[in-house]
Design a protein with these regions (language model features):
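A short glycine-leucine-enriched loop at secondary-structure breakpoints
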Residues: 72-80
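Non-catalytic substrate-recognition and accessory regions of acyl/acetyltransferase enzymes
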Residues: 1-73, 87-150
Length: 150
């Protein structure tokens, strides 16, 4: 399963114990290879995803999950979305400021890969982690955890 299958599954919707998860909107990103997803749970916005499909041979694919509702973290929806995106994307960015446990762990000095979110990403095969607690410019967005696998 990869890009088109991932998008198809999300557009069709996925029933969870929490309710129905679905891709409510897809719009063109800044580049030809980039799309913006709006993902809903039970008809309410859950998060946005910036999806970059790569530009071979120069740039690899990545996805960033941001403006995430606090109720997402620690749920079946979080587990499923991270699993689905991890199958297609070797680089994943997850904004964590509404993930109170991960935020607290990072502020106390716990390494990114040992936080609640980091352990979840590590279990999906990611091996490199970076805490973007101080984004370098105005385009990078908020605090996020970067996870990559080779």
């Amino acid at each position: 399963m990869c890009f088109e299958e991932l998008k198809r599954r999300l557009l069709e919707g996925i029933d969870l114990r929490q309710g129905r998860l679905h891709l409510a909107k897809v719009s063109q990103g800044r580049f030809l290879e980039e799309e913006n997803y709006t993902i809903h749970l039970n008809g309410e916005r859950l998060l946005f995803a910036k999806v970059f499909y790569g530009r071979k041979p120069y740039y690899k694919e990545w996805v960033e999950l941001f403006n995430i509702e606090e109720g997402f973290f620690g749920t079946e929806a979080e587990d499923l979305l991270l699993e689905l995106f991890s199958k297609c994307f070797r680089r994943l960015f997850v904004e964590y400021y509404n993930d109170l446990q991960t935020t607290k762990e990072l502020k106390s000095g716990i390494p990114p890969q040992e936080t609640r979110l980091g352990k979840k990403l590590k279990s999906l095969g990611y091996t490199y982690f970076k805490d973007w607690y101080y984004p370098e410019g105005w385009m990078e967005g908020g605090y996020k955890l970067q996870a990559e696998r080779l």
